[in-house]
Amino acid sequence: MNALKRFADYFFKEPFSALKNKNGSTDKGEWLAWRPIFIFAIIFSLFGLIFLARDAGISGDEFFHVFHSKDVINYYKTGGADKAAATPTASNNLPYYSQSPDTFIHLIINAFNIDDYMPYRHLLCNILGWLGILYASLLARRIGGWRAAVFTCVLLFLSPRFLGHSFNNLKDIPFASACIMSIYYIVKFLDNLPKIKISTAVMLCLSIAFATSIRVGGLLMVAYFGLFAIIYYIYKRKTLKPVFFKTLLWSLGICVAAYILCIFTWPYALEGPVSNVYDAFTNMSKFQIAIKQVFEGRMQWSDNLPLYYSPKFILMTTPIIVLLGFLLSLIFLHYNRKQWFYYMVVLFTALFPICWIVFDRSNVYGGWRHLLFTYPSMVVLAALGLNSLLNLIRNRYAKYAVGLAYLLLCINPISHYIRNHPYEYVYFNQFVGSTKDAYGKYEMDYYYHSLREAADWVKQNAKKDSLTTGDKIIVACWHIHPANYYFKDDTAKFQTAFVRWSERGNSDWDYAIVCTTGIEPGTIQNGTYPPKNTVHEIKVDGVPVAIVLKREQKYDWQGFEAMKAKDVNKAKELYAKALAVEPTNETAALGLAEIYLTEARTDSLRADRLPKAAKLLDTFIAANPNHETANYMKAHYYLMNNETDKALALCEKVIFDNYKYEGAYMLAAQAKLQTGDLNGAEDYLTRLLNTGRLSDNLVKTLLQIFKFQGLDDANAYVKLYSLLEQYYLKIGEKKAAAEYTQAIENVMRQQYGRQ
């Protein structure tokens, strides 16, 4: 009760008494009313976040974490016998993460046998997102006062990317909150020196443990603690020298205890408390799975993005008011020089991870969600910058004018929320123009929130027709796990099916839900997307982030099935019918073109089939100018038509559009071989090897080329093994490289009798 009374006195009684006495300032010159304003703002942010998140969909990665949570729980249930949660694979790096929030909520879900469990996951995410807002605000208050705390709270709530991910991203948002919580307690712990408050030490320990129990990158908080403690000790060495060893022991104890706590929630770490944690830390930014995404109007691989990808995305998607405040904080560093240590802490924690990701060329995707943990620090700096400007202005009316300018800059994200809820995170600022201006240039709903609204529309509006092949309406979707969840209570009427956008004509479905994410930007930019059989669109700022398609014909699927049955004539007939309905039908156009190109290998049919293939491909490419398979097939046509230069040019275009497209390199090498350019063919195949697309066909072709170049068997193998040795060294596979080093020595020994 005493604590509650002190709280009420500090935040309400004292400010309101001061207002009544017309004395609204503390001895530091801050208006006391900022205290109750902060309480109102922080409470509003919690309930506002929970209210807005009710309409959120399932995030793109959510089910992977659901499945891993079950593996983690099984690991503990079986006493470690079930090691699925502790065994990383090439396609599953989740054992590198502890993901404690996921595990915690699924323990509750299992305990109460909750069927509709996604809202509970999202509620936990909301609360943890709000925790980040709270601790960022408290950090700002510690440095700049309660007005800075209010600014931080408001700016984080009005940050569309942060708020939108707080709806359902139970990995990046809890990690961001745990990190800012750790930073806050690091500052508080150091501030308290030479005294050591046990409550602060305990909270710092729990914060670091919490961060590391979500993602191994939480160990960065240990490094932060050590770095900032050393700097603070040097700064305050006269005061702190007598308590150096005491402080050192406490600091080590905090870090060791945090490490032990996080290990208990992390199966992979339990299997190897030192080696596995080190392995996870060194591999956390080296995702083995690269994905393609739209950036700067091109489809690009996530492991080959420009160095400025993350910084640019941050600049494009952060509200101008935050960027302005951040800039002001740098401008006013001299003015705030007495607080240099605190500014250094916040600035370093905001910028260092971004710089490291750029330097390390990390494999990142999905905008900058992997860097969300830096954002609370950025916003704290922004709030301090805005606060400093107001502190410097002495004229009351000038303060009002600046405050009004701040409010006007907040209108843009607020209006975005109103127009585009629940897709708050699909946001681009005025540097880009608007979300509409970014359409076709950058990914929109990359976390697939819009699937929920699309599924709801299908459930309410879908009807059987003459094309329906069974008792149920088949709903196709690339993201099958969320689709299954959305339709789990309607299985009497609906059946879900997995279908990729590029293969939508290859299977049976009646309706398809398609997220615009992953659609080739050339198709978007030339206006052929959405296709004409679109019956519903989910839009953000007037552009579709997801669509619902209704099947108009199934000739393409039937033709595809005929080809699988090797009934070429029937396939040709069915593909032609599909094209009569939809001239740019992907399955039909490319399927029929492939048939014609195959038939053109027969001399008697070449003159008839090649022009037909070219016409089909030209029509399709006009609608889909950067379609890799279509352009690759057109390059085949050119090579068959003895237009080698055009074939090579088109192969280069395909490689530019997708540097991992194996067929383009192989076809270009074939073209070079046909012209007798052995070195040119070798160059294409070496480039292919360096993309990581190693195959038996590539190795055999290289060996053949080396022999054509005049090398005997032994030297051809030595040259091949040397290439493979260099490749494996380049990607860090020292063991594989050593095997080829040994193979070279064996060949040389056999050839020349070397000992």
Per-region residue spans from a language model:
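Transmembrane-helix motifs of polytopic, lipid-linked glycan transferases
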Residues: L123-I143, M181, Y185
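Membrane-lumen/periplasm interface segments of specific transmembrane helices
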Residues: L252-K286, L408-E424, Y684
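C-terminal luminal/periplasmic domains and tails of membrane-associated envelope-modifying transferases
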Residues: A3, T435-Q755
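Transmembrane-helix signature of polytopic, membrane-embedded enzymes
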Residues: F38-F40, A136-L158, S177, K195-S199, ...
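Membrane-interface helix-loop-helix junctions at transmembrane boundaries of multi-pass membrane enzymes
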Residues: D27-L32, L193, K236-L252, L328-F348, ...
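Signature aromatic-anchored transmembrane alpha helix within multi-pass, membrane-resident enzymes
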Residues: I39-I43, A223-I230, S251-V256, H334, ...
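Membrane-interface transmembrane helices that cradle and orient dolichyl/undecaprenyl
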Residues: S182-T200
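Hydrophobic, aromatic-rich transmembrane alpha-helices
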Residues: A136, K312-W340, S388, A497-V499
